[in-house]
């Protein structure tokens, strides 16, 4: 979300390696970061992930066990503090409506045949349009990482094996005498698999 929306506050939080949910809570609730409570952070986490999936005030209210007006207020505060996110969501809906699909940063397309339908079907397509560039780009990145890691294993002639991928994690089986080498190099390989373009915010 931070990369695609190019929202200044979100990008800054990631650059500073901050706890993104705590940083969001501080912005939404108008607190210093060290004053954010566990409940504040919990609410911010639900908002962060919920908005990625196009969660409505009704959905947020149900998820948090609060009133719809209170939930709407949280969402409004979030967009006020992170205007780039709101702009990204609006521009993505418009793009999907215009061309009938969205793309990941790497050009993989999700076609949205329901984007010109009415009611709930269109709403679902709009949610998919907002979410797909984020989730899809993350999926592309982890696949590129798997390819790079396997190539490195083969080039080094290691006995380590790539066993499983879960979300943004790679599970490996590593002989004891290769543990230090893998621990040192795996993060570097995954971090350097590609450089996301930064000159086209909002364009996938």
Report residues per predicted region:
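Conserved catalytic core of nucleotide polymerization and phosphodiester-bond processing enzymes
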Residues: 1-204
């Amino acid at each position: 979300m931070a990369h695609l929306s190019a929202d200044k506050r979100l990008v800054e939080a990631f650059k500073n390696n901050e706890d993104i949910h705590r940083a969001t809570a501080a912005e939404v609730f108008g607190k210093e970061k060290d004053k954010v409570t566990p409940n504040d952070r919990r609410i911010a986490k639900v908002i962060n992930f919920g908005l990625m999936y196009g969660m409505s005030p009704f959905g947020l209210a149900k998820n948090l066990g609060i009133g719809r007006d209170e939930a709407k207020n949280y969402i409004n505060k979030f967009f006020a503090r992170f205007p780039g996110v709101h702009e990204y969501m609006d521009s993505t809906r418009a793009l999907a409506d215009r061309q009938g699909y969205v793309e990941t940063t790497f050009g993989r397309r999700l076609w949205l045949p329901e984007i010109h339908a009415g009611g709930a079907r269109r709403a679902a397509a709009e949610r998919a349009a907002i979410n797909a560039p984020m989730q899809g780009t993350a999926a592309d990145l982890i696949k590129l990482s798997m390819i790079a890691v396997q190539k490195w294993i083969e080039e080094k002639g290691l006995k380590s094996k790539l066993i499983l991928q879960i979300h943004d994690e790679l599970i490996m089986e590593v002989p004891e005498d290769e543990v230090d080498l893998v621990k040192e190099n795996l993060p570097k390989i995954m971090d350097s698999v590609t450089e996301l373009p930064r000159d086209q915010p909002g364009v996938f």
